[in-house]
Amino acid sequence: MAERPVDRSEEAGETERVRLRYERRKADINAPIYSPLDPSVYMGQQEKERALIRWIQQADLAPVHDRRVLEIGCGSGGNLLQLMKLGFVPKNLTANELLEDRAELARNLLPSAIRIIKGNALDLDLPEESFDVVHQSTVFSSILDDEFQGKLADKMW
């Protein structure tokens, strides 16, 4: 993962704003719009899985059992569960989550073989090319600062 000099004061401000956004969302977590028992939510999840399968095929990642994946912003671990369902092996999965409570939820839901790293993704110190895939799903929709988005994208690349 590439490095770029980081202005820690700007980073801290945006990181705190992300934390506050997720705090506000907690109140809505049990809203019907998130329930997989709602057919439209369930169909959306299925479409996401179909898109993931298409991407795996187009990126020529199959077979996936030996692919190493890092997910930035793993939340409660739903994407990692989906990857395992498609054949990715837990010992080859690593997750990063900024928010402590979400990282703990992921730890409780996911197999112990999955490494979960708590904290800011910009602070990750992982060897170059230690992953076949660096994945994020909705991280950039939670970060509104363009410069911070750029730094994170560079880090992931």
Regions found by a protein language model. Name each.
Residues 150-157:
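A short glycine-rich, Lys/Arg-flanked "PGG" loop and its adjoining helix->strand segment in the class I
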Residues 45-65, 82:
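Conserved alpha-helix/loop element of class I SAM-dependent methyltransferases that forms part
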Residues 135:
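A conserved beta-strand element that flanks and buttresses the S-adenosyl-L-methionine
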Residues 138-142:
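Short catalytic micro-motifs in class I SAM-dependent methyltransferases
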Residues 32-47:
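Class I SAM-dependent methyltransferase Rossmann-like catalytic core
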Residues 70, 76-123:
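Class I SAM-dependent methyltransferase SAM/SAH-binding core
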Residues 1-35:
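N-terminal, positively charged/glycine-rich alpha-helical extensions of SAM-dependent methyltransferases
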